[in-house]
């Protein structure tokens, strides 16, 4: 997701090896099972993966990567053989597969260039910028006390057409094609599509976060719909989907500051508005590492 410019002045988650010995030879030494070979890991994605404003910022400045983002957490936990993080704030699907990304640090290569036949593990978080998720959320901000004339859900679903749902339907085939392109580059790689989390609880928490209840529910339901589309594409294109909504329930932008996995409109943690916090990145990284170890 892009770092939004908000009008109030803010710019903008071993396998246990049991050794079995023969009953007839209780004293025989049983060799340890060989450890899994270290993985060659590549991380692709947008700012939901890169970690803007989370200390310490590393890599290309224009991509706003943190050394505490979930790819770094995964790499450390799995003790990978090699690790390449090409996640970049503002990325859209085309920046992964075909079009260099323009940033404040200059054009960045297509992210897929980092994937090779030797790559064993790929994580990817993409889609939020494709459908304008953050800009939609920013457009729903209001400091009015009444919902009259201030419900962006009504505007975004005017005439019976849900524009966000339409954008998801339009972009979903491209997500599948992107996964095919990754698999073509790394035929033996395990590909994990990492979804977007629970940013808002039911009804939100207006005015603590300046999104009216109807709009909070609309935004989160749109995130859920995008996740479902990403999951479907993953399943249809030989990848796996990592659900981060469930693990982030109770850790949304309305949670206590030290419990947030996603930062609010006015940041109270070192993270970009409406983006993961360091705690969120740690939780997401833990979940991914656990999934990789389990199979």
Q: Which stretches of residues belong to each language-model region?
A:
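N-terminal export and membrane-targeting signals
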Residues: 1-12, 108, 167-171
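C-terminal region of N-terminal signal peptides and the immediate post-cleavage residues
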Residues: 8, 17-40
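Conserved N-terminal glycine/acidic-rich loop preference
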Residues: 121-124, 147-185, 192, 196-241
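Sec-exported extracytoplasmic/periplasmic mature domains
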Residues: 75-79, 101, 116-120, 177-187, ...
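Solvent-exposed loop/turn segments at secondary-structure junctions
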Residues: 47-50, 88-94, 128-132, 197-201, ...
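Catalytic nucleophile-elbow at a beta strand-turn-alpha helix junction centered on a G-D-S/GDSL motif
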Residues: 39-57, 61, 131
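Catalytic His-Asp segment of secreted/periplasmic serine-dependent ester chemistry enzymes
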Residues: 196-295
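Conserved SGNH/GDSL esterase-like catalytic core that processes O-acyl groups on lipids
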Residues: 57-173
């Amino acid at each position: 997701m892009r770092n939004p410019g908000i009008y109030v002045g803010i710019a903008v988650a071993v396998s246990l090896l049991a050794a079995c010995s023969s009953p007839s030879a209780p004293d025989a030494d049983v060799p340890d099972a060989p450890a899994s070979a270290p993985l060659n890991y590549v991380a692709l994605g947008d700012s939901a993966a890169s970690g803007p404003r989370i200390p310490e910022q590393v890599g290309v400045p224009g991509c706003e990567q943190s050394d505490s983002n979930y790819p770094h957490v995964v790499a450390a936990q799995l003790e990978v053989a090699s690790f390449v993080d090409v996640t970049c704030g503002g990325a859209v699907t085309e920046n992964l597969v075909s079009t260099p990304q323009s940033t404040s640090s200059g054009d960045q290569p297509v992210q897929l260039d980092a994937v090779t036949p030797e790559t064993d593990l790929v994580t990817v978080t993409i889609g939020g910028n494709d459908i304008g998720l953050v800009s939609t959320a920013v457009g729903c901000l209001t400091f009015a006390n009444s919902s009259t004339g201030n419900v962006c859900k009504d505007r975004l679903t005017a005439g019976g057409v849900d524009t966000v749902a339409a954008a998801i339907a339009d972009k979903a085939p491209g997500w599948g094609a992107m996964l095919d392109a990754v698999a073509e580059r790394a035929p033996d790689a395990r590909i994990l599509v990492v979804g977007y989390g629970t940013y808002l609880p039911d009804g939100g928490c207006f005015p603590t976060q300046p999104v009216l209840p109807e709009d909070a529910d609309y935004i989160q339901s749109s995130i859920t719909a995008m996740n479902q589309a990403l999951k479907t594409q993953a399943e249809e294109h030989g990848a796996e989907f990592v659900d981060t909504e469930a693990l982030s329930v109770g850790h949304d932008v309305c949670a206590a500051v030290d419990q947030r996995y996603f930062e609010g409109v006015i940041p109270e943690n070192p993270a970009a508005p409406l983006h993961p916090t360091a705690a969120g990145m740690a939780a997401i990284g833990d979940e991914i590492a656990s999934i990789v170890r389990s199979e």
